[in-house]
UniProtKB/Swiss-Prot annotation:
Compartments, as annotated in UniProt: Nucleus; Chromosome
Keywords of this entry: Acetylation, Chromosome, DNA damage, DNA repair, DNA-binding, Methylation, Nucleosome core, Nucleus, Phosphoprotein
Gene Ontology molecular function, alphabetical: DNA binding; protein heterodimerization activity; structural constituent of chromatin
PTM statement from Swiss-Prot or TrEMBL: Phosphorylated to form H2AS128ph (gamma-H2A) in response to DNA double-strand breaks (DSBs) generated by exogenous genotoxic agents and by stalled replication forks. Phosphorylation is dependent on the DNA damage checkpoint kinases MEC1/ATR and TEL1/ATM, spreads on either side of a detected DSB site and may mark the surrounding chromatin for recruitment of proteins required for DNA damage signaling and repair. Gamma-H2A is removed from the DNA prior to the strand invasion-primer extension step of the repair process and subsequently dephosphorylated. Acetylated by ESA1 to form H2AK4ac and H2AK7ac.
Transmembrane is among the record's keywords: no
Entries under InterPro entries matching the protein: Histone-fold, Histone_H2A, Histone_H2A/H2B/H3, Histone_H2A_C, Histone_H2A_CS
Name listed for the protein in its UniProt record: Histone H2A.2
Length: 131
């Protein structure tokens, strides 16, 4: 008689996470839990955490790619807050999204006002053309 809870005859497959099903690296289950516990709404649909997780993963990848480029431009192999600051402030859309965000140890963008720069000298060739 085989009527028990034995493993014989059962074809259990390993459970796959919602992150793996969606092809994401960020945790869908954790985002779903945070949405439920955060009192954002009484109920949270099953697609909302997947969509939000994919958006968060995309933003993180975008910022890290630009920060990696900034680190490489400065001949560094490690991303520091300064590189994050440069990446965000030099990108128009990210700067608009994170305009009021302060990044600790980020510094400021290098900027010299035009009136403080030395005046350009006129070329000698221009005087002969006016005659």
């Amino acid at each position: 008689m085989s009527g028990g809870k034995g493993k014989a005859g059962s074809s259990e497959k390993a459970s796959t996470s919602r992150s793996a099903k969606a092809g994401l690296t960020f945790p869908v289950g954790r985002v779903h839990r945070l949405l439920r516990k955060g009192n954002y709404a009484q109920r949270v649909g099953s697609g909302a955490p997947v969509y939000l997780t994919s958006v968060l993963e995309y933003l993180a990848a975008e910022i890290l790619e630009l920060a990696g480029n900034a680190a490489r431009d400065n001949k560094k192999s490690r991303i520091i807050p300064r590189h994050l600051q440069l990446a965000i402030r030099n990108d128009e859309e990210l700067n608009k999204l994170l305009g009021h965000v302060t990044i600790a140890q980020g510094g400021v963008l290098p900027n010299i006002h035009q009136s403080l720069l030395p005046a350009k000298k006129a070329k000698a060739g221009n005087a002969s053309q006016e005659l």
